[in-house]
Amino acid sequence: MYRRFSLNDEKLEDFKRGNFMIRFLRFNAPFKSETEVHKKVNDMYIVYSGKAKVLLSDDYEGGREVEPYEIRGCNILNYETIDMKSGDVLFIPANTSHQLLVEEGSLTIVIIKIPEE
């Protein structure tokens, strides 16, 4: 199946096929996502424009399971801060706690959800 996407479209739509999903998102500062851990899904962040910080760690505590294998609202412990800008790509493996921060300007990002199975 063929489908064309443009990040210049006013309304970006997600694409989902089976367990594979592409999300097109725009955020304006200040923005702080909820912390999350995907037990069976890898994330790939592709920054189209703007800049952001991503907190990452294999170490976290607490949180709530919002659906099977998906944790939200955890406390990220011993995290590393990754600075991202236009053109950067970040692969976040399953079981890694993460949080996205936009501190100034705006961010347009493509997030690809890649199942482990």
Per-region residue spans from a language model:
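Short hydrophobic/aromatic-rich beta-strand segments that constitute the beta-sheet cores
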Residues: 24, 54-56, 109-111
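Ligand-binding loop in jelly-roll beta-barrel domains
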Residues: 83-88, 94-117
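Short histidine
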Residues: 31, 37, 67-68, 98
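Short acidic-glycine-tyrosine-enriched beta hairpin
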Residues: 59-94
